[in-house]
Amino acid sequence: MNDRITLAQAHCQPREKKEHKLGQARLAELLPQVPGWELSNNGHALTRTFQFDNYYRTLAFVNALAFIAHCEDHHPDMNVHYGRAVVCFSTHKIGGISEIDFICAAKTSALYEQGI
């Protein structure tokens, strides 16, 4: 049995020191684990656009994501539109991406896949 947990099963631990900022090699290793996400803001953030049938479903997703973000104490930047939400994770205190951004990206993708 594999005792490793997935990113979506992990929980966020504070990552506020500069040494927690991921380098290019680690980013390249983790990015395939969050399909659909891409580096943005000159490699300082993870971004994905989620599509929905209507505004109600978009807001339901955003509200569910807000609950997850609150529980993990790591909050994305979001742009909400009719039929889509753009979600962007970065660790502002380190000026880039840390492992908690990947954890939250994986949790966000899992939420979307549930059909919320």
Curated annotation (Swiss-Prot):
InterPro entries in UniProt: PCD_sf, Pterin_deHydtase
Record-level GO BP terms: tetrahydrobiopterin biosynthetic process
UniProt keyword Mitochondrion, yes or no: no
Reactions catalysed, as given in the entry: (4aS,6R)-4a-hydroxy-L-erythro-5,6,7,8-tetrahydrobiopterin = (6R)-L-erythro-6,7-dihydrobiopterin + H2O
A single GO molecular function term of this UniProt record: 4-alpha-hydroxytetrahydrobiopterin dehydratase activity
Pfam families documented for this protein: Pterin_4a (PF01329)
Disulfide bond entries: none
EC number: 4.2.1.96
Superkingdom in the source lineage: Bacteria
Record keywords, A-Z: Lyase
NCBIfam families, alphabetized: PRK00823.1-4
HAMAP family (UniProt xref): Pterin_4_alpha (MF_00434)
Name this protein carries in UniProt: Putative pterin-4-alpha-carbinolamine dehydratase
Organism of derivation: Xylella fastidiosa (strain M12)
